[in-house]
Amino acid sequence: MGTGLFGTGQTAIRATQDLQIISGLPPLVREDDNYRAQLTLRNTTAKPMKVEVAARATLLELQPQTVDIPAGEAREVAWNVTAPAQLGQIRSEAILWEIEARDTLGGARDALKARQRIVPAVPLTVQQATLVQLEGPLTLEVVPPADALPGRGGLKLALQPKLAEGLPGVRDWFARYPFTCLEQKTSRSIGLRDAKLWQTVVAQLPTYLDKDGLASYFPPRDGEAERGSDVLTAYLLAATHEAAGIEPGFAVPDEVRAPMERGLIAFVEGRIQREFWSPRKDLDVRKLAALEALSRYGKAQGRMLGSITIAPNQWPTHAVIDWLNILRRVADVPQREQRIAEATQVLKSRLSYQGTKLVFSTERDDYWWWLMTNGDVNTARLILAVLDDPAWKDDMGRLANGFIGRQQRGAWHTTTANLWGGLALEKFSAKFEAQPVAGATRASVGAGAPAAVDWARVERVKSTDPAGAPHQTTWFGAPASPGSLRNNTMFLPWAQEPGRQPLNVAHTGTGRPWLTLQSVAAIALKAPFAAGYQVKKTVTPVEQAVAGRYSRGDVLRVTLEVNAAADMTWVVVSDPIPGGATLLGTGLGRDSQIATQGEKRSGGAWPAFEERSFEAFRSYYEYVPKGTFKLDYTMRLNNVGEFALPPTRVEALYAPEMFGESPNPRVKVEAGR
């Protein structure tokens, strides 16, 4: 149409203020990091300034400073501080800053509020845990782990009137879980009953679907072949359907679910194919999982079984459970009643108990980690499958107790097991537990001061409560969420006396509360540890101001060499970075394409997704073959100080007993020349 009708023109808008504060605080630090908290003050006027700067920060003592700033120039001010250790050990995990600057000559002012995240260098972890029902006084001998850091940790006791109130050990496990694929974000949001996180997952979910409607663990890259996973899609639809039976808000919206259903139907009918590495043939088993998910929404039909060889005796247990659920929901399957009886008999014949712990006779062959399933998942899903079946009524109490017996350190092994497990025990409790709890539960260690839970004060967190208020000073565990209980926990520090001390717990009143007892300690890794993976780290300067030492502004190349003992799917490599450092290669501002040009990859593993944060570099692999692979990443050191680093870690996400760790020394960064 040309410019005749519209005309042309331009203008420039410049907004500024006479005095500006620009933060140079590292976005993340770790407890006891010694660092230079730096700010830049800018004088945008044509006159010199004499600026007084006053700063306040959580648990830090900061002296006011005065600085002369010539016209049109900037000056840096800084305080040498140590990150308060106690802030890294509570849920708020923040140093809150308030900075005010005033020109004493002209009166110009500026103010800034900033928030630094602070995390533990050696985090508290659960060393041992148990879940028991208090049917009488409980006495156990307890002792802190030999290598535990002094003054940290103790015994956490959480009480629930019934299992339907949730499992504190599982919630704590989810709260600490660091990884972020679609399955993990979904499982965490439901496991924590975090409605806000779930809404974020729902909003992002369409970006994870390929053109066929199948979900990917990470958002597909442009131009990639259709690589959405039928296994992940079936899990998402099945798990959210089960969760929605407890809280309807965790259902997948119809408009998001519809393409996923179409993708699974096309997969089952053979109109699309998905081929992934696996140690054995699994197509029939994957189709059963897809049909089980579809059957929950009335989208499965008997004719869809045509390509599947029906052989429940030869299937892994998770496939038999899928088969039983399909038979119950799909009315037009031939010989339906006979096959339900057959599947029930197969499942009952595989059950056995080691003491109170439930195991399957086929446990070794049931570990299909590449399909995100294992004996824990199978037990939870079996409870859900037979909860309302009269033929299983007499088995339910033993099944639930046997499933609790499979826990290690207060939770199960994987995200999928903890999600299914939490749902299973909540639904079991809602059906079979009715007696209320009243009175008081008291606990003490040795001659130490006792603690108590008064059941008259135990109440639910409300959505109207101030955001974060119930848990900002919590020293360990999951945050409170609406609907969960509060005033139901006790903390007992480790006894001052050496050696074993008796823990005594007793309930007076009505009911039989459930006790989750966790032994919590901070233990630093002192030497490399390999359980399926070995990891070696090499740091090489790319740009270095002073040879042989690290200075602010230096650019470093980090090489991680990983040796894998076996083929494995979905492996993550996680390497921490010093406080204030920047990972290059993001393509964002202040990035350097030149500095990252020398990065190399070697070996048979190629990343499906890379995550760059202020805390760590993480690389996720869909498949890692046996043998050695290497990866590089590049970072810039931005802050002066001495910084602690947690261990470098490699972990198989769905076989977490396969992992490797290597400790990292503190990193000292000096001022540049």
Feature roles, as predicted:
Residues 1, 57-59, 75-77, 81, ...:
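Long, domain-scale non-catalytic interaction/scaffolding regions in large secretory-pathway
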Residues 5-6, 17-21, 56-64, 71-73, ...:
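Short beta-strand and strand-turn-strand segments in soluble, beta-rich domains
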Residues 12-18, 28-30, 56, 68-70, ...:
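Short beta-strand edge segments in extracellular beta-sheet folds
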Residues 19-24, 535:
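Proline-enriched interdomain boundary motifs that mark the N-terminal boundary
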Residues 25-30, 66-67, 410, 545-549:
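Short beta-strand segments of immunoglobulin-like
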Residues 36-44, 559-563:
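Short edge beta-strand/loop segments characteristic of extracellular beta-sandwich folds
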Residues 38, 78, 86-281, 287-292, ...:
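Extended, solvent-exposed functional surface patches
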Residues 45-49, 567:
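Extracellular acidic loop/turn motifs
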